[in-house]
Amino acid sequence: MSTSKRKRADEVQWNKRSTKKKASAPPVKKTGGKADRPSLQIQTLLHSGDTMITVPSGGGCDLISTYARGSDEGNRHTSETLTYKVGVDYHFVADAGACRYSNRGTGVMWLVYDTTPGGNSPSTKDIFAYPDALVAWPTTWKVSRELCHRFVVKRRWLFTMETDGRIGSDIPPTNQSWPPCKRNIDFHKFTSGLGVRTQWKNVTDGGVGAIQRGALYMVIAPGNGVTFTAHGQTRLYFKSVGNQ
């Protein structure tokens, strides 16, 4: 005679429920990720019309980390800033003096970090200390050995411009056609990973005289005497860090 007993229906249902896995708790969301970080601030420097950049022989140097103290997005909110990214979007146009000749030149744009600015923006010769014989050849310029501890080239870009002895408003004869040349060009660059730290004095303006340490300049020089004007904008992506 069999000694096994038939299980009751309610007992079978109980065993099925007890063997089911317990629902796991939802994962705890970690803080401090990218989504929790404050977004970068943006400052845009517009150069058009009266504020266009004139690039003479020997080039020019302009401060671009011009963060005045304030509450807007483009202002610094603390005594220290970190510039991470820079975008430059410009249209270069050879000036009338350069267009009188048939010529070609390779120009250079640099982003230069100045560890200890002295209250005034330096000239290109202050940074590179080139001899006068090389003023028209910026591709040969290097930061002087004596000042390599102060000036650091963060980025360097080349561009080529051409002239053919004519200006843009000249009209060819009906039986001729003139080939195009690069008397006006578009120049677009975007760079990240700069990590430029700027410490500010206890003042509200954003000029070079307000910087205690760490200025960022945009330096442009024409090649072979093809001087020009620059129309466009520079956009800087930065954060306000440090103490209020």
UniProtKB/Swiss-Prot annotation:
The listed locations are: Virion; Host nucleus
Q: What is its main location?
A: virion
Q: Name one GO cellular component term.
A: host cell
| Residue ranges, annotated region (Disordered) | 1-38
InterPro entries associated with the record: Gemcoat_MSV (IPR000143), GV_A/BR1_coat (IPR000263), Viral_coat (IPR029053)
Q: Where is this motif: Bipartite nuclear localization signal?
A: 1-24
Keyword DNA-binding applies: yes
Query: Origin, by domain of life?
Result: Viruses
Q: Matching Pfam families, A to Z?
A: Gemini_coat
Task: Give yes or no: UniProt keyword DNA-binding.
Answer: yes
Q: Which GO terms describe its molecular function?
A: DNA binding; structural molecule activity
From its record, what is one biological process in GO terms? symbiont entry into host cell
Keyword list (alphabetical) reads: Capsid protein, DNA-binding, Host nucleus, T=1 icosahedral capsid protein, Viral penetration into host nucleus, Virion, Virus entry into host cell
Q: What does this protein do?
A: Encapsidates the viral genome into characteristic twinned ('geminate') particles. Binds the genomic viral ssDNA and shuttles it into and out of the cell nucleus. Plays a role in protection of the genome from degradation, virus acquisition and transmission by insect vectors, infectivity, and systemic movement. The CP of monopartite geminiviruses is absolutely essential for virus movement.
Quaternary state and partners of this protein?
Answer: Homomultimer. Interacts with the movement protein. Binds to single-stranded and double-stranded viral DNA.
What family name appears in the similarity comment? Belongs to the geminiviridae capsid protein family.
Q: What is this protein called?
A: Capsid protein
Q: What is the lineage of its organism?
A: Viruses, Monodnaviria, Shotokuvirae, Cressdnaviricota, Repensiviricetes
